[in-house]
From Swiss-Prot:
Domain of life: Bacteria
Protein name, per record: UPF0434 protein YcaR
Family: Belongs to the UPF0434 family.
Classification via Gene3D superfamilies: 2.20.25.10
InterPro entries the UniProt entry points to: Trm112-like
One GO CC annotation: cytosol
Bilayer-spanning residue ranges: none
Length: 60
């Protein structure tokens, strides 16, 4: 995942900043508590593909 991409893309739900979780290979929106998957290194920024973060994940 190219970190320069994170400077360009935004959450498709709230237009907020996104964070990369290397361990889970996900792009995270902390404002909406959503995790977007990476497929073959490409972020899938579709709300229908996102999962809701657990309470523990939201805290970190």
């Amino acid at each position: 995942m190219d970190h320069r991409l994170l400077e360009i893309i935004a959450c498709p739900v709230c237009n907020g900043k996104l964070w990369y979780n290397q361990e889970k290979q996900e792009i995270i929106c902390k404002l909406d508590n959503l995790a977007f998957p990476l497929r073959d290194g490409i972020p899938v920024l579709l709300e229908t593909e996102a999962r809701v973060l657990t309470a523990d994940e939201s805290k970190s």
